[in-house]
Regions:
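Ankyrin repeat A-helix N-terminal signature
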Residues: 10-16, 43-49, 76-82, 109-115, ...
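Ankyrin repeat start-site detector
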Residues: 2-3, 35-36, 68-69, 101-102, ...
Length: 223
């Protein structure tokens, strides 16, 4: 077809294990790429088909081939919360800190969805905890922005720098305050987040916060 989808890629993305078995037995090309450079492994990883991922890895499928937007099987497994697949890919040498076109890593994507198990797996395999994706967003900022308190706690336990600012000067604390995530604000304050920092628009977390309960937690900072 125009998209160059092989029978193996289609079977892998649809989760048809018995067809994958038959095709592999007939020496199907494991790493054949579709027109967007995705492979059977990529599709199985994205769609959460763990058994197929394991079969493809046993047939030496390439774990670090770059597909559309410079993403890899590890990216899409992390992004979609497939913990067992992330584990299997890392065990087969998936590169943990590859970046996609947006400067994102598997870690920043896992933090964005608040999957603490995957965050911890990636960190255990040496992921850079303070990596900044496009616009300066770190895993901690993304977790705080989306109210993923358990992920925030995990990142801090694993050495994330609390007060890093993105390109707009906004910290994890400011993002949590802006989006009404009181629990995340509490955790960040308990760990000593700097309340005096200002964004590029000259505002502190207290000034950014809309929720009165959050405003109360944050000391007003005089100039």
């Amino acid at each position: 077809t125009k998209e160059k989808l092989t029978a193996l890629i289609i079977a892998a993305l649809e989760g048809r294990t018995h067809i994958v078995d038959k095709l592999l037995a007939k020496n199907a090309q494991v790493d054949a790429q579709a027109s967007d450079n995705t492979t059977a492994l990529y599709m199985a990883a994205r769609n959460g088909h763990t058994a197929i991922v394991e079969k493809l890895l046993a047939h030496k499928a390439a774990v670090n081939l770059l597909a559309i937007n410079d993403t890899t099987p590890l990216f899409v497994a992390a992004q979609n919360g497939h913990t067992d697949i992330v584990k299997a890919l890392l065990a087969q040498g998936a590169k943990v800190d590859l970046q996609d076109k947006n400067g994102a890593t598997a870690l920043t994507l896992a933090a964005l969805i608040g999957n603490t198990d995957i965050v911890e797996l990636l960190l255990k395999h040496g992921a850079k905890v303070d990596h900044k994706a496009t616009n300066g967003f770190t895993a901690l900022i993304l977790a705080a922005q989306n109210g993923h308190t358990a992920t925030v706690e995990s990142l801090l336990r694993n050495g994330a720098t609390m007060d890093l600012q993105n390109d707009d000067g906004v910290t994890a604390l400011m993002w949590a305050a802006l989006h009404d995530h009181a629990e995340a604000v509490k955790v960040l304050l308990a760990k000593g987040a700097n309340t005096k920092l200002k964004s590029k628009t000259g505002r502190t977390a207290a000034e950014i916060a809309k929720d009165p309960a959050i405003k109360e937690m944050l000391p007003a900072v005089s100039n």
